[in-house]
Amino acid sequence: MSINSITSYLGISGRNFIVFILVGFFAIQNLAFQIIFRLNIPYSIDFSDVFSPVFNQIVKDEFSLFITKGIHIILFPKLISYPNFYLNSFDVVNLTYIYWIVTSITLFVMYLMIKQTDKRLFWTLIPISAFLYNPLTSSGYWMVGMLSWYFPMLGITSIIYLLNRKTINLKIFASGVSLAIFSTFSILLGVVSWIAGITVLLKAVSEKRLENKKWILLWIISSIIVGFCYLFLTYGTTDSETHFEVLFSFTGFSFISNFIASSFRLKFEILMLLAGTL
């Protein structure tokens, strides 16, 4: 069977077929890496933050799902880990497969986002998948601890896709709020999901794609309610004082800009600031 007949059967262009093949290659080689080596290393930099509480929950019957790491509430990674630890004798190999599934779903949502906006950008899935499935950055050592970081990635990506539609109903909105809560209670970085959601909604209103502005108000109310719940759960859980005023200083701006531009690895700080700002 020729490539032309395959692409005709699938209803995609030859260029997109090449993108599909390359993305599939990166995904398969990463999964093969996990299956062949089965790196069951029950330790990572975030082990004590995610798995020690789960261990105490099972062994000592201590309710520890809401135990915080500083001001991080790593709830959903613990909920995912709990049945695996309990039923699988604390083997963490299965969690590396969950990482692969989460990454693949995120990449698929990115595909839907591109299809929703500009199909000419399908080629960007190649470098994105190369980074996400790179064994050097997703080894068995890091995968287990990285679940708490990849959950917000999935949540934020899905929120942007859902709220960027021409029409928003209660079901779509509730799904967006649920994903934002999922991201927020996976790690503190997940609060960005609320910013992503309001940004998409405001953009839709400015472009006159969203006539009913009640969704913006409901999104703000939801974020405030969840924010108060988060502060209630984290209040008094850390010995170090939290200085929120720093966020509104140049130091806070510099930190956020450098964080956004971290993937560029620029040599000078001023370049990182410019990249993060732009």
Where are these regions (language model features)?
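Membrane-interface alpha helices of multi-pass inner-membrane proteins
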Residues: 172-199
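Start-transfer (signal-anchor) and selected internal transmembrane alpha helices
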Residues: 1-30
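Aromatic- and kink-enriched transmembrane "portal" helix at the membrane-lumen/periplasm boundary
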Residues: 123-154
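Membrane-interface transmembrane helices that cradle and orient dolichyl/undecaprenyl
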Residues: 151, 156-173
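Transmembrane-helix motifs of polytopic, lipid-linked glycan transferases
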Residues: 97-124, 158-162
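Transmembrane alpha-helices of multi-pass, membrane-embedded glycan-processing enzymes
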Residues: 81-85, 95-109, 148, 152-155, ...
